């Protein structure tokens, strides 16, 4: 019987289990006990033959159960079969029978989510002796029907777009091929599963292993699925991890390690991310030993007392900290792998940038960095972001993004600089238009759920203490106090004096941070400096807008903006040429043709650039 003839018959819900068994098509060499019981429609004999084929000892079944349980997210959205499997070791025989019967009645023979099918197959692998003969055969039939549906009848075409798509083309065929080796339909299932994994890695990772930003929120479930797939094959003395797939997987893990910080695993989305412990378990299943530097780092981060401590493993044993991929559309700016790290993750694959900002090991901001621009009162529709400039050295990590609308003559430039040497973060938005008019602009950045109580931390952290927001009475400085972390904010594009005129304002409340500005002209620059370095938490500060000159003529601030910030004995310069001139411009005694200069100012007045940017290059 051909595939096209036999598969629809197996999917017929009108057949009883006895008649259905008689319709099975077996490969040559299938065990006589299975074939004989099947052709006779003998439920008890078929169940007994199935158990004979499972060679796992009770001890091995228990060990495999515990291993596979650690490779599932403990998620409230799990289906009934996944939940039942996660509670398998503590359930009684009666409870298990009842829950499986309920699950099979709930799903029927309609297509079930691939993860539910995988859980059903796992019961057949690790718990056949705990099932009654009737339930064993019913579950076996249900799994065969589901596998035929997903693998043969409605296979996912093209690149998988969802986790369910990936499970149906990769893990499910691998496990199904192992569990049903004697069925004719399963002949190529294992090879299909191997091909599915290889194709997914090729299509969703950059050449260095950077994962497509659209998959970041599913990074851990993907690694768990890969770990389960490897576990199934290892139990059959095989391996999924070819040299090519191993290389892709190792690159992915290195690039995604930045998602791990003390006590949490980021996703750059609102999706549940899983835990550091689940991340460690996935790596263990993929061959990462307990002594591997990455697993040691995750163990450090999982310690509730680790945040703010400098207890990391050796830097040269870990991946490079900074990375950015135009193809994957995200970047990581990071100071170190220590537990007191500072980090900015940037996902710019859509019209709104997504940020995840960790300061001194604490997640402070997380979510969409939204922006709204109005031109003469008319809202401007944002375009997609692209990365126009990146820079990295021992002193600073820098990423520059742009939105360009040629039709409306609008360019928005977004700058992010993480000061690695002296700590501190520069954020700046610059708007340029072809025609002068009224520009109204506002951006918002939400706080992380880890620092706002009652927001519901996605990783199950205890609720944070209520933050305190401070606004200086005489200046425009503001601060947010999160338990032992104080973040100071300096709007460098406006005068320090609160009573001096300014074209905008800064807002700070439980919802997050926002800045808005309204000017008349064809450009504006909105820089902000954030400081949280503990030695500077109460240091006196001052900042001032600087005079910018070209060939002895003062340049209006709508054409170029310069600002100097002083915190104690440390000083920084921020300069941006909104409309570059024909000659070098002078700011704080520094002559430059560059569009952007962000620099440290030494005590003697010497300018030491952290980054210099023009439209063509970075130095």
Language model regions located:
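Catalytic and substrate-binding regions of extracellular carbohydrate-active enzymes
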Residues: 288-483, 522-526, 555, 601-619
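Ser/Thr/Asn(+Pro)-rich, low-complexity disordered segments
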Residues: 1-112, 343-347, 352-368, 379-380, ...
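Eukaryotic intrinsically disordered, low-complexity regulatory regions
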Residues: 498-505, 526-529
